Amino acid sequence: MSADLAMGPELPTSPLALEYVNDFDLMKFEVKKEAMAAHDRANIRQCNRLQPQGSVSSTPISTPCSSVPSSPSFSPTEQKNHLEELYWMPSGAYPQQIDPQTLSLTPEDAVEALIGATAHGHPPPPHVQQQLQAGAFDGYRGAHHHHGHAQQQQQQQPQHHHHQHQYGAIPHHPDDLSGHPGAHGHHPHHHHHHHHSQDPDSPSPTSPEQLHHRHHHHHHPHGHPGQQGHHGVGGGLNVEDRFSDDQLVTMSVRELNRHLRGFTKDEVIRLKQKRRTLKNRGYAQSCRFKRVQQKHLLENEKTQLINQVEQLKQEINRLARERDAYKLKCEKLTGANGFREAGSTSDNPSSPEFFM
């Protein structure tokens, strides 16, 4: 774009406005013109035809000619010399203001993309400029869609606190610059952790799928213990062989359910049936033991009672023999007197027969 267009009769006399317009004079910047010179001149002529007469904006406001939003225009009908209108370029939300449908590449687009490089006094080589011109603004299409997602991932991983979102399409990591030949040593002040702000359409060799795989690679060992046990079962270890009979019987239901996470439903049902069988067997053995113990107690008591009965029988026999002895002795004593009166002595309380 020529300098005559930037200097019009309606240019305001404010020094700040003049400095603002002169900062965007495109004649100061070097743009590669071998392959795209004719295309750039055609776009410039088309943009000049669409430029309104009352505007002195350095960038055309027609969106098919440029994907960069137009700067605040200075027309005599609207005198808005607010400072916030002049500071639209350094704002962090610059990539979000771009129309995602405009894909035309103009010298203005290339200059705006290379502002970050020329600001440090290290202009890139011409072939790097061509690569940046070809792929830089393709990433601007989804920049405002992925800006919130990058901020959310930045909050989730606070170790990437060096994240900066200046230009989503310009790679700042030294690994990302490996895809561009001759680009090492470029941007020494922007080698930050830029893993999570890469756009899906960015020409960087590090794709979001690789970043996603790299992110999940660190969290892979934190799987569920039941799932690891399930992989162990597939390695030849049966679910019934993982626990002994004593462990199944003594283990609580909550602990058993925690160990059975990751197994199939059939294996869980089979193991619980085995546990129920073992518990029933334990209950039966306990009842049998109690019955045997009670039987032993009863048998011991019976033996004691039998012994007591034998002792009582022996006592009865002894008393019977003693009785017979006393009876014979009494008969001998009565027979020695020589007379016996029938029934006379039986009624006498003093006779021995009275007690028999």
UniProtKB/Swiss-Prot annotation:
Source organism, top-level taxon: Eukaryota
Entry keywords, A to Z: Activator, DNA-binding, Nucleus, Repressor, Transcription, Transcription regulation
A GO CC term attached to the entry: nucleus
Residue span(s) of domain bZIP: 270-333
Biased composition range(s): Low complexity: 55-77
Region of interest (Leucine-zipper), ranges: 298-319
Cited CDD domains: bZIP_Maf_large
Segments of this protein annotated with the region Basic motif: 270-295
UniProt GO MF annotations: DNA-binding transcription factor activity, RNA polymerase II-specific; RNA polymerase II cis-regulatory region sequence-specific DNA binding
Functional description taken from the UniProt entry: May act as a transcriptional activator or repressor. Involved in neurogenesis. Involved in the development of rhombomeres (r) 5 and 6 segments from their common precursor 'proto-segment' in the hindbrain.
Complexes and interactors: Homodimer or heterodimer with other bHLH-Zip transcription factors. Binds DNA as a homodimer or a heterodimer.
Stated family: Belongs to the bZIP family. Maf subfamily.
Record-given protein name: Transcription factor MafB
Gene: mafb
